[in-house]
UniProtKB/Swiss-Prot annotation:
Gene Ontology cellular component terms for the protein in this record: bacterial nucleoid
Species per Swiss-Prot/TrEMBL record: Haemophilus influenzae (strain PittGG)
Known role: Involved in DNA repair and RecF pathway recombination.
Lineage of producing organism: Bacteria, Pseudomonadati, Pseudomonadota, Gammaproteobacteria, Pasteurellales
UniProt-listed GO biological process terms: DNA recombination; double-strand break repair
Superkingdom classification of source: Bacteria
Stated family: Belongs to the RecO family.
InterPro entries listed in its UniProt record: ARFGAP/RecO (IPR037278), DNA_rep/recomb_RecO_N (IPR022572), NA-bd_OB-fold (IPR012340), RecO (IPR003717), RecO_C (IPR042242)
Pfam families noted in UniProt: RecO_C, RecO_N
UniProt protein name: DNA repair protein RecO
Length: 236
C-alpha cells in the first residue's frame, strides 16, 4: 500500500544497516511515523542530503506495518536556516515530538504549529516566545487540561497580584508558599492568553512547561538539552 504524497519533516535519523537509514518523520496528514530509507547511506544516494532536519519535504512511503519503507522524498522548499541557539532549540522541539506524540496519529493542527515554530526559530531575534508558545500548544494537543483562570481550591477568579501553587491533576491553589511550583496570578493570566511578550512571564512559562511535560517525558533526560549545555560550556 502506497501513501499519498504529503508534506513532512525529518525529526531524527540513524543508521539502519551499512546502506540504509531509519528515519523518524513528522507529516501533515499521518503524524509521526518511522520509515526505512533504503540505500540512503550509499555514496551516490540523493537522499543523503535530502533527509535532513528542518527541510520541508514531500514524502511518500509504502507498507502496512508500523515500520514503513520510504518511496519518495524531495525538498518542497529550502532548509530553514537554524543557527547556534536556534539550531539546538530546533533539535529540542524535534525530540519533544519524537518522545511525546503517538505514532501514526494524524494532527494537522500540530503540524502547522511546528511549521510556525521552525519559521520563528529561523527568523526571530528572540526565540523564547516562539518556544514557549509551541510548548503550550503541544500541551493543549496532548490533552493537558489546566485552568489558568480560576483557583482550584476556591473556584475564585485568579488575582493578578496573588501567588498560586501548582498541584498536579488539580491546578493552581492560592498559597503564600514560594517555591518552584509557585506562580503569580499575572503569569497564569498570561499563560491563558498565550502572551509571552514579558521576560518574567517567559521564565515562569519555561518553569511550568518543564513541570507539565515531565509526566510525558519520564525520567530519561532530553539529549538535545544535554547537547546544548555541553556546547555552551565549550564556548565559555
Amino acid at each position: 500500500m502506497q501513501s499519498e504524497l504529503q508534506r513532512g519533516f525529518v525529526l531524527h535519523r540513524r543508521p539502519y544497516s551499512e546502506t540504509s537509514l531509519l528515519v523518524d518523520l513528522f507529516t501533515e496528514e499521518s503524524g509521526r511515523l518511522t520509515v526505512i530509507a533504503k540505500g540512503a547511506r550509499a555514496k551516490r544516494s540523493s537522499w543523503k542530503s535530502v533527509l535532513q532536519p528542518f527541510t520541508p519535504l514531500l514524502l511518500r512511503w509504502t507498507g502496512k506495518s508500523t515500520l514503513k519503507t520510504l518511496a519518495k522524498a524531495e525538498p518542497a522548499a529550502i532548509t530553514l536556516p537554524l543557527q547556534q541557539i536556534a539550531l539546538y532549540s530546533g533539535f529540542y522541539v524535534n525530540e519533544l515530538l519524537t518522545r511525546v506524540i503517538e505514532s501514526e496519529t494524524p494532527n494537522p493542527a500540530l503540524f502547522q504549529h511546528y511549521l510556525k515554530c521552525l519559521t520563528g526559530l529561523a527568523t526571530e531575534t528572540n526565540i523564547e516566545p516562539t518556544l514557549r508558545l509551541f510548548e503550550f500548544q503541544l500541551l493543549q494537543i496532548l490533552g493537558y487540561g489546566v485552568d489558568f483562570l480560576h483557583c482550584a481550591g476556591s473556584g475564585e477568579p485568579v488575582d493578578f497580584s496573588m501567588t498560586y501553587r501548582y498541584r498536579e491533576e488539580k491546578g493552581f491553589i492560592a498559597s503564600l508558599v514560594k517555591d518552584n511550583l509557585t506562580f503569580y496570578g499575572r503569569d497564569l493570566l498570561a499563560f491563558e492568553a498565550l502572551d509571552f511578550s514579558d521576560d518574567a512571564v517567559r521564565q515562569a512559562a519555561k518553569r511550568f512547561t518543564r513541570i507539565a511535560l515531565k509526566p510525558y517525558l519520564g525520567d530519561k533526560p532530553l539529549k538535545s538539552r544535554e547537547l546544548f549545555t555541553q556546547n555552551i560550556l565549550l564556548l565559555k
